[in-house]
Curated annotation (Swiss-Prot):
Binds 1 [4Fe-4S] cluster. The cluster is coordinated with 3 cysteines and an exchangeable S-adenosyl-L-methionine. HAMAP family: RNA_methyltr_RlmN. It comes from Magnetococcus marinus (strain ATCC BAA-1437 / JCM 17883 / MC-1). Its EC number is 2.1.1.192. The gene is rlmN. [4Fe-4S] cluster binds at residues 115, 119, 122. S-adenosyl-L-methionine binds at residues 165-166, 197, 219-221, 295. Its cofactor is [4Fe-4S] cluster. Signal peptide: none annotated. This is Dual-specificity RNA methyltransferase RlmN.
Length: 356
């Protein structure tokens, strides 16, 4: 029976050590060398790994293959934001976005081809859902960006899982990928530098809190159940009361806050009454709010709230004591802004119950 070849970059350090020692019969230090080549030196080929014996490299070659994505398109926005459309080994395509700032560079990575959810204002959700990404396909976005940007003296300092997909519907792969990103002997992103975003898949959200300890961002978008049922259909399964209760239980590390993402839709969710309901919803939850001017895409029935309306909404939240930021429309001219990513989904499949 044919055994699929591994991509070594998708193995946690523990899994890689087990493979090298138990399956290949090598010493543990060989696993450490291999890990360093993959996640510190960012090697792309076994031939580059000059301090590994030829015999060891032959063993690795027999059971593994690098599944590096190919660049289909690369766009750079007027504001410096960059977007890559990456082709995977099966021909599916995902989008990865780099957002440069003065003191940091944030990489927005995808976790699915398409999205399990079907939020009607989001271009990704409109594409349907094809499949989950593997751990290596998630990690490879970071390795690719680090190599590519380093050649231009740019750094990736922060990771946000806010690209295509609902990360928690692909939790096992996302967990392994995040553990690889966090590993101190490799890419070494601190837990404060990685943000996991979810629309509120509550059982997995609580599991992520226990197992990963990274920053949490929740795509809220409405503070009335009837409206959130429409904008975020997952709300029909896990409503606002359940979401609030789960967030209160979430094991936040000292000094950290939950980030709430709220897209501002003209005449839909942007009233002052909505802002006051938002304040009530956040009671006793250490929170930061990102208000996101809606980024339109062809055929969508929504419009963005005016900046005057957004500022009035912000003022109510701010006066209640919450840090509230109006997010810049980074990358809007290349469709790289929030809600605009679409990739190229082939053979979309039905979504799981409760996702739409």
């Amino acid at each position: 029976m044919h055994t699929p070849l591994l991509d070594l970059t998708g193995l946690t350090r523990e899994a890689l050590t087990s493979l090298v020692v138990e399956q290949l019969g090598e010493k543990p230090f060989r696993a450490r060398q291999l890990w360093s080549w993959l996640h510190v030196k960012l090697a792309q080929h076994l031939d580059e790994m000059s301090d590994l014996s030829i015999d060891f490299r032959r063993k690795l070659s027999a059971l593994s293959t690098p599944l590096r994505p190919e660049v289909s398109t690369h766009q750079i926005s007027r504001d410096g934001t960059e977007k890559w459309l990456l082709r995977l080994s099966d021909g599916q395509q995902i989008e990865t976005v780099y957002i440069p700032e003065d003191e940091r560079g944030t990489l927005c990575i995808s976790s699915q081809v398409g999205c399990t959810l079907s939020c009607p204002f989001c271009h990704t959700g409109a594409q349907g859902f094809a499949r989950n990404l593997t751990p290596s396909e998630i990690v490879q976005q970071v390795l690719f960006a680090r190599r590519t940007l380093a050649a231009r003296d740019k750094r990736v300092t922060n990771i946000v899982l806010m690209g295509m997909g609902e990360p928690l519907y692909n939790y096992e792969a996302v967990r392994d990928a995040v553990l690889i990103l966090l590993d101190d002997s490799g890419l070494a992103f601190g837990t404060r530098k990685v943000t996991l975003s979810t629309a509120g898949l509550l059982p997995k959200m609580e599991q992520a809190g226990r197992e990963l300890g990274v920053n949490l961002a929740i795509s809220l978008h409405a503070v009335r159940d009837t409206l959130r049922d429409e904008l975020v259909p997952l709300n029909k399964k896990y409503n606002l009361q359940a979401l609030r209760a789960a967030t209160l239980r979430y094991p936040l590390k000292s000094g950290r806050r939950v980030t709430w993402e709220y897209v501002m839709l003209h005449g839909v969710n942007d009233s002052e009454d909505d802002a006051r309901l938002f304040v009530s919803f956040l009671k006793d939850i250490p929170s930061k709010i990102n208000l996101i001017p809606f980024n339109p895409w062809p055929g969508v029935p929504y419009q963005s709230s005016s900046m005057t309306r957004i500022a009035a909404f912000q003022k109510i939240l701010y006066q209640a004591g919450f840090v509230t930021v109006i997010r810049d429309r980074r990358g809007e001219d290349i469709d790289a802004a929030c809600g605009q990513l679409k990739g190229a989904v082939q053979g979309a499949r039905p979504r799981p119950p409760g996702a739409s």
